[in-house]
Amino acid sequence: MSKIRSVRRRTGAPRQDEGPGTGVALLAGAVLGLATDAVVFALPREQARLLAGAGLAAASGVYLGFAVADGRRSALLVQTGELLGFTALAVLAVQRDSPGLLGVGWLAHVTWDALHYWSRGPTRVRSWYPSLCIGYDVAVAVPLLTGRL
């Protein structure tokens, strides 16, 4: 038998199945992301990029909150690393005035969300949250990646 096991089996981090379905959560996330875009577009460009960077750090912090609720040390350590990594990327992107790098950060966060959606992330999360976050992240990333922000 292989010594390599899936994260889900090793951590016992099943999704919790209360809440809206995947499609509803994706749509809700996209609507929230578009609402955020509307606010960001109303700001001067420098402030808009700062807000988009702070948003990426905040979105990463949500998973740390799930890790606190989860209570396992391993989840706390991994999610703290995730928060530090995405925050560092956001700071770098804002300092370099690089909306493209910030957009890449938001899309990279989609990967983190997908791991949790497929129950491969290290932390127990509500089943609907990764889908909501994916919809939001993509909606926020697109204007950054297309040069509209």
Task: Identify what each model region corresponds to.
Residues M1-L149:
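Short amphipathic, positively biased membrane-proximal segments
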